[in-house]
């Protein structure tokens, strides 16, 4: 338990009696996910004392943060990244997406399992494994986790120069990222791989958290629903700002279905550049359209990997254009 002066109030709060008993582990998360246990605010506050002012008692006599507050969520992420991944500096500009780290970690771990399934059950690790993060954003979450857990090398792309500027600062301030994360701007907002992948460039996997709304209004309506569930309807006048996310992060023409369908079509022109192309799919109703696009693109193999965080279910779709013989040759050469 914390004992030094600034946390005295927090210490008293965290020892309140009649606290609600919560499960010790979050259900559904990947077995290797470092965030399976409930947030240990004692430990997080030691790693990142800046978190302490954002801690407050809940109605159940527990300690937490206000998850409707972008500053509180950002500070929680900063503490998690420092405590679990050794990231000394991490910051994002106002209004940029501040992603939930446990869910992002699940994607990385399931992606590792996907690679292992093609490598005799052994997860390929180290700098020989190259991963392309489409839409790395200002937060660099996937490269941070992938580098720390598996030693992978990343290229992160984004169309927003402000996001890349913030990401470059994170890289420059953390030695573990300097030689393992390369950042590239996608200058054509209609392209995904074109202009990024060189002819002879090879990636073992791609990952992407696509913009899933079809308009700014749809994104705002979703955020209002989230705020209402948190009992924060009074702050819904500025919905996007409360949860974070620039327009390019939250929505695009055609929404999730349109974006991933374009990704599938473009990936077919880069069939030999990557072993597994993958993308998160937030809406289950999007899947039939994506499967149709993959059939049209003549993908050799398609997998859907389900993930869960409590009652929330998500998934990512993975596809490859490599034949079994080409997959075996890739494994022998790179892993």
UniProtKB/Swiss-Prot annotation:
CDD domains, alphabetized: AdoMet_MTases (cd02440)
GO (cellular component) term, any one: cytoplasm
Primary location recorded for the protein, binned into one broad class: cytoplasm
SUPFAM superfamilies linked: S-adenosyl-L-methionine-dependent methyltransferases (SSF53335)
Keywords noted in UniProt: Cytoplasm, Methyltransferase, rRNA processing, S-adenosyl-L-methionine, Transferase
GO terms of biological process kind: rRNA base methylation
Gene3D superfamilies the UniProt entry points to: Vaccinia Virus protein VP39
EC annotation from Swiss-Prot or TrEMBL: 2.1.1.181
Pfam families assigned: Methyltransf_10
Catalytic activity: adenosine(1618) in 23S rRNA + S-adenosyl-L-methionine = N(6)-methyladenosine(1618) in 23S rRNA + S-adenosyl-L-homocysteine + H(+)
One MF term in the entry's GO annotations: 23S rRNA (adenine(1618)-N(6))-methyltransferase activity
Protein purpose: Specifically methylates the adenine in position 1618 of 23S rRNA.
Family: Belongs to the methyltransferase superfamily. METTL16/RlmF family.
Protein name, as recorded: Ribosomal RNA large subunit methyltransferase F
Organism whose genome encodes this protein: Yersinia enterocolitica serotype O:8 / biotype 1B (strain NCTC 13174 / 8081)
Taxonomic lineage from the root: Bacteria, Pseudomonadati, Pseudomonadota, Gammaproteobacteria, Enterobacterales
Gene name of the record: rlmF
């Amino acid at each position: 338990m914390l004992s030094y002066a600034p946390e005295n109030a927090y210490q008293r709060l965290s020892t309140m009696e009649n606290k609600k008993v919560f499960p010790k582990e979050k259900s559904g998360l990947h077995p290797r996910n470092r965030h399976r246990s409930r947030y240990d605010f004692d430990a997080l506050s030691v790693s990142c004392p800046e978190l302490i002012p954002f801690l407050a008692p809940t109605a159940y006599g527990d300690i937490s943060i206000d998850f409707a507050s972008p500053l509180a969520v950002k500070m929680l992420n900063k503490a998690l990244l420092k405590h679990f991944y050794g990231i000394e500096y991490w910051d994002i500009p106002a209004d940029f997406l501040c992603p939930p780290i446990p869910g992002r970690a699940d994607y990385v771990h399931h992606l590792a399992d996907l690679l292992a399934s093609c490598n005799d059950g052994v997860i390929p690790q180290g700098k020989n494994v190259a991963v392309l993060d489409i839409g790395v954003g200002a937060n660099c979450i996937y490269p941070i986790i992938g580098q720390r857990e598996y030693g992978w090398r990343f290229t992160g792309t984004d169309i927003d120069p402000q996001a890349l500027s913030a990401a470059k600062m994170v890289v420059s301030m953390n030695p573990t990222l300097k030689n393992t994360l390369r950042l590239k701007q996608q200058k054509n907002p209609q392209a995904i791989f074109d202009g990024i992948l060189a002819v002879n460039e090879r990636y073992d996997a791609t990952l992407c958290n696509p913009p899933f709304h079809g308009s700014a209004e749809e994104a705002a309506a979703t955020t209002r629903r989230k705020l209402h569930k948190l009992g924060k309807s009074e702050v819904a006048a500025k919905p996007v700002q409360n949860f974070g996310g620039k327009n390019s992060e939250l929505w695009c023409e055609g929404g999730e279905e349109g974006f991933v369908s374009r990704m599938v079509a473009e990936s077919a022109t880069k069939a030999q550049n990557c072993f597994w192309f993958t993308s998160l799919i937030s809406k289950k109703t999007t899947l039939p359209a994506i499967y149709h696009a993959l059939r049209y693109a003549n993908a050799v193999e398609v997998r859907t990997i389900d993930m869960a965080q409590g009652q929330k279910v998500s998934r990512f779709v993975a596809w490859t254009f490599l034949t079994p013989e080409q997959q075996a040759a890739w494994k022998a050469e790179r892993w």
